[in-house]
Amino acid sequence: MLTSVFTMKRNLLKVPVYMVLAGLLLAGCGKKTDKNTSSATGWKINAKEGGFQYNTDFKDQETGPGLVLIEGGTFTMGQVEDDIMHDWNNTPTQQHVQSFYMDETEVTNKMYMEYLDWLKRVFPPDEEQYRNIYIGALPDTLVWRSPLSANEAMVSNYLRHPAYAEYPVVGVNWVQAVQFSSWRTDRVNEAILERDGYLAKDARYQVDATSTFSTDTYLNAPSQTYGGKIAGEMGGKKTNKEGEATYAKQTSGILLPEYRLPTEVEWEYAAKSLGGIREYNSLQGRKKYPWDSQYTRSTKRRTRGDLLANFKQGKGDYGGLAGWSDDKGDITVAVKTYPPNDFGLYDMAGNVAEWVADVYRPIVDDEITDFNYYRGNVYMKHAIGEDGKQIVVTPENVKYDTLMNGKIIARNLPGNLATVPIDSNETYLRYNFTHSDNRSYHDGDKSSTRNYRNQNDLMAEGSEYTNSMYNAPRPKRPGSDISGKGYDTSNDRTSLIDDEVRVYKGGSWRDRAYWLDPAQRRFLPQYIATDYIGFRNAMSRVGSKAKKNHKTPKG
């Protein structure tokens, strides 16, 4: 009797196991999904006969040269310490940032010199029509001068001397930093296309002013790349079944997004690197600096007492005593001199402050958006010619902008596609945006009120600046000669803020420790360069948030 009972119990325990195994076998017999078969139509993808072609083998975005992946998340943007300066321009707000990439270090003199060398070789400044392309990209080395300082050695040597090769570039204004970023995008993608066989070997060394590479042109008007030479000697080995050259497309997944300046929220998020104080889904405390300490000196046993950034320590003290240099430098120091933060980024506090993409306003308007916050959107589209094709910038039709300080800068390099602001064709009956230029969006000016009519009515009332919230000085924009320069001497200006002032973040070798806090924000006109502001690049991440999709207990 007992034996039969035990047998029944054992059989009952076995039943679920058999059922599970049977279920697994049935599931395994189901039809497998073929990645090269459309789940919409059942047609073949990437068939030799033709039809829809798509990169079904794409795994993950390639990490561009010099970049580090910053996994996105939520954080408190703004000052969490006492506002001793009473600026009231960085009130804490909760923001979320998408994953992105950022340069491991600031852009160095050597990196910028590579840019200048390329411009000089492709657009020789001794030829009149190209002169302003090269000259407009030159950093302002005179930023080192001071009426009561002997700094002429820095004026002559800092940019070009190999002793400063790995030091951060300075004397670069915001506009120049943006243009370097665009140039870098094209050079990186050009190398990728050559590596993957879409361009001829060493094609990038055979360019001149009439045959340069542009990522935008390659994607949208590929036959016009290299001034139309891509169909000949510049083309790669990849061909279709007819023997014609093939081009990489957005669907190929091999070209990288653009290098650009980071937004303010990206820069601050990356600088704070809160992963180091995270446990599971909560933060254990808060950070005052990019490192996990309330002090500017190391608390680790091996390096205890060492400074963790390059900054001004006191009046007349930029580096300590001879033989016992506190921060290893008087001015800037080589990148990677100090330990990185928890994201692996160097010099996010000290050395040089850094330009970010945003137009400055005292308030970060989290009521409008708390996701990828950015003030500065100006939406553009490709210019279309009379023949219905996109217009490619040539040496003959390149346009130049004259900045407020008289510096002349090329708007687009030859080989790029010309752009114009979007118009009613793109904004008609839209809810998410209504204008091309959104730099002053919802900043308290007349267009932000319920009585706002339309932009044309405002312009008809008088000057375009009459109704602006921030009534900044407007110096006369210089002409082609020095006599065209003039200052705004009116007495009714109330602010230095306008749509051409940009945020810069972080402390520098000239700043006291207060400015090392990543939440601090300052601004300057985008045409101004200094001896303490540099920059680094960022890049958007496409696809998944992280390379590894599993959670970790600690950052």
Show the residue positions of the predicted features:
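Functional-site microenvironments in short loops/helix caps that host divalent-cation chemistry
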Residues: T33-K48, L69, T76, E81, ...
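Bacterial N-terminal signal peptides
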Residues: P16-L24
